[in-house]
Amino acid sequence: IVTVDCSDYPKPVCSPENMPVCGSDSKTYSNKCDFCNAVADSNGTLTLSHFGKC
């Protein structure tokens, strides 16, 4: 199982780093910060599919 530690999120501003991750919604998030903010917005229903683009 692939996981991302989102304990430090959500953050008001994410850095522009480009390290894509693929969410369970089949959307590519530009980095862990953007993904974790989306997890927070989804009330935990969004999960990580895999690292890299979807």
UniProtKB/Swiss-Prot annotation:
Task: Tell me the SUPFAM superfamilies matching this sequence.
Answer: Kazal-type serine protease inhibitors
Q: Could you tell me which InterPro entries the record lists for this protein?
A: Bifunctional_prot_inhibitor, Kazal_dom, Kazal_dom_sf
UniProt note: domains: Avian ovomucoid consists of three homologous, tandem Kazal family inhibitory domains.
Q: Kindly state which keywords UniProt assigns to this record, in alphabetical order.
A: Disulfide bond, Glycoprotein, Protease inhibitor, Repeat, Secreted, Serine protease inhibitor
Where are the bilayer-spanning segments?
none
- The organism is Nycticorax nycticorax (Black-crowned night-heron)
- Which pairs of Cys residues are joined through disulfide bonds in the record? 6-36, 14-33, 22-54
Q: Where is the Kazal-like domain?
A: 4-54
**Name of the featured protein:** Ovomucoid
Which residues are annotated as site, described as Reactive bond 3?
16-17
Q: Which Pfam families match?
A: Kazal_1 (PF00050)
Q: Which PROSITE patterns match?
A: KAZAL_1, KAZAL_2
Q: What's a Gene Ontology MF term here? A: serine-type endopeptidase inhibitor activity
